[in-house]
Amino acid sequence: GGTGRVEKSGDDVLTLSGANSYSGGTLISDGTLVASNVEALGTGDVTDDATLELNTGGTFDNAIGGSGNVVKSGADTLTLSGSNSYTGGTTISGGTLVASTVEALGTGDVTNNA
């Protein structure tokens, strides 16, 4: 919990799997951050300047911005419900991705490989 921010840097993959309640947001500056729980990234906005991989089901409410890309993996159905402005595109590599708003998939291309 708390008001701090989580920052992911470095080329490696970091997986967050627990439910977290921090509110200061998440910054992904390098590598890949995998969220395997819709509550893994707390309640703040996500600045994705690398790769955010969502390997989970449920509804992801956090706003996603930045120049990075979003990958939906795993077999579950995930709904993006935030007003997202990320520009790096969206890749669906597994499961189903539902956009509940026009802005949910950011402004980049969408590639469906599922």
Feature names for model-found ranges:
Residues G1-G2, V13-S67, T79-A114:
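Surface-exposed loop/turn positions within long extracellular repeat scaffolds
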